[in-house]
Amino acid sequence: MQVVAAVDKFRGTATAREVAQAIGQACWEAGHDCAEFALADGGEGLLDALGGANRTARVSGPLGTPVEAGWRLHRGTAVIEMAQASGLTVAGGAERNDPLGASTAGTGELIDV
């Protein structure tokens, strides 16, 4: 049997690449071939799913504290992961998030790099 493991991350647990590799390992142990593909919906995990080396830029986080956000050039196109500049994890998480005081200015700064 041939299996295709095309998966996104398990939020807070494993990256898309780790999930695909775990499925691939289980398939191999069961005697099946598996093609592993890490996917992303464009948010958190996008750059990891693309693979390769990222560049980073220091930008304003959603609550004003500077954060390091990744980006890269992929086949002549700049790819950013908005979650690294303005996502919930850099906005204090679900417990400390301040939607009315937060800003996505850091995403704009990342685009301007």
Residue map of PLM features:
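N-terminal loops that bind phosphate or other acidic moieties
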Residues: 1-113
